[in-house]
Amino acid sequence: MYKLIKARSIVRIPPNEFGKPLNEIALNELRQQYQEKILKDLGLVLAILNVKTSEEGILVFGDGATYHEVEFDMITYVPVVQEVVEGEVLQVDNYGIFVNLGPMDGLVHISQITDDTLKYDNVRGIIFGEKSKKVIQKGDKVRARVISVASTVTGRLPRIALTMRQPYLGKLEWITQTKK
């Protein structure tokens, strides 16, 4: 789930940046501090926007920089259990498929793709159904549901487990055929 979060912080403006527009300098500092990092309870920070920097700064003894209060917006992504997502198949392996969810990737275990018995063909890099003859391969567009999000080491992307074994989930081509 994407979130727009309003935040406040203190930004250090180094002396070599004095004279430049405060909001631009603060934006660069905030990007270095937060962007592409995982923050507890907030998720993966994708972008920093709408920076408003206080004109008045604070001097700290022994440091030539000024410190300014800033207000800004962050766009973050947090995978949520039960969320329905769509993405492109990035990789097909004998144990399942990896799906690009945008900022992160998720895994659909082979047992969670469909009710059919599935086989992996490593020569063609596909998974196919024994009875249905349905094929899934790299580049296919799929819809899935998040069934678990496992935290890893701090600062690392979480592992996202997906399922496609529910109505209106699966390869988008299969879903449109079912609707007809």
Curated annotation (Swiss-Prot):
EC number(s)?
2.7.7.6
A single GO CC term for this protein reads: cytoplasm
Can you give the residue ranges of the S1 motif domain?
Answer: 82-165
Q: Which residues cross the membrane?
A: none
Locations listed in the record? Cytoplasm
Q: What does the record give as the reaction this protein catalyses?
A: RNA(n) + a ribonucleoside 5'-triphosphate = RNA(n+1) + diphosphate
Q: Which domain of life is it from?
A: Archaea
Gene that this polypeptide is encoded by: rpo7
Q: Which family does it belong to?
A: Belongs to the eukaryotic RPB7/RPC8 RNA polymerase subunit family.
- BP GO terms, sorted: DNA-templated transcription initiation
Q: What does this protein do?
A: DNA-dependent RNA polymerase (RNAP) catalyzes the transcription of DNA into RNA using the four ribonucleoside triphosphates as substrates.
Entry keyword set = Cytoplasm, DNA-directed RNA polymerase, Nucleotidyltransferase, Transcription, Transferase
Could you identify this protein by its name? DNA-directed RNA polymerase subunit Rpo7
Write down the top EC class of this protein: transferase
Task: Please report the organism this UniProt entry assigns to the protein.
Answer: Saccharolobus solfataricus (strain ATCC 35092 / DSM 1617 / JCM 11322 / P2) (Sulfolobus solfataricus)
What GO molecular function annotations does the UniProt record carry, in alphabetical order? DNA binding; DNA-directed RNA polymerase activity
